[in-house]
Amino acid sequence: MKFRYVVYKLTFPNGKIYIGKDIGGAGHSINYFGSWDNTLVEQDFTKEQLSDFTIRKEILFESENKQEVNQKESELIIRHQSNDEAIGYNQTHRPHKKTL
């Protein structure tokens, strides 16, 4: 059975997470792992660590409605705090830094 449109969570070996969505084509593709910034991820690991690298993928939400998936992705990024650079790799919904 194939998933429709989904929001997923990737967990990297260092425990940091990325929340993403797959709303393409006919639905979720098992080999789709999002559009996270690989330079941000790579800087957290040594070359040796990157040579044996496992990412866990969990489906958090599924819907037939792309707009609902878009909304849920934003909600889950905030809920899981994956937009906090200490916790995750999401670049959207980042808190604004206060300037003095």
Predicted regions and their residues:
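Structure-specific nucleic-acid interaction/processing domains
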Residues: 1-100
